[in-house]
Amino acid sequence: DTYLKTLPPLRSKSDQKSLWDGLMDGTIDIIASDHNPMDIESKRCEFGKAEFGTATIENSFGWYRAKKANQRALDRWVEAVAHNPRKLFNLKDCSIDIGNYADLTIFANDGSLIEKKTLGANVPNWNQNGRAIGIINNKKIIQL
């Protein structure tokens, strides 16, 4: 299945469990994604000829929620994808306050919302529980 051709490659169940354990016990500080959406032609071909990649930014939260939905796991996930990368790169903390410009991602909790801009984003048989639907940054609202 060319939708599953990613780099780095998808890992075994044992590796996935180790990653979750590392996130929960603090061994893993930061989670990043290689957001690399592909067009139809790049994925509708033989596996060996298919390009590596899939859209991950708007899907990663839904994939996460389909697997781990408790509050502690959510707090650790948000810390690893949002707060800790900002600390690493010495970026200021974001806060929602009167007079501040918003800098945030908007998520929808309802189902998989499978409207996609590329076929690479539509990875078959991966359950989702919501996804990012937009961002607010620099006084602009961007719908995904």
Language-model-detected regions and their locations in the chain:
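Short C-terminal domain-edge/linker segments immediately following a structured domain
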Residues: 12-21, 60-66, 131-139
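C-terminal cap of metal-dependent C-N hydrolases
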Residues: 49, 101-144
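Short clusters of hydrophobic/aromatic residues that line enzyme substrate/ligand-binding pockets
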Residues: 6, 10, 47, 123
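His/Asp/Glu-enriched, well-ordered alpha-helical/loop segment
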Residues: 22-107
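A generic local structural motif
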Residues: 15-19, 92-93, 122
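Histidine/acidic residue-rich metal-binding segments in metalloenzymes
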Residues: 1-31
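Short capping/connector residues at structural and topological boundaries
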Residues: 9-11, 15, 52, 119, ...
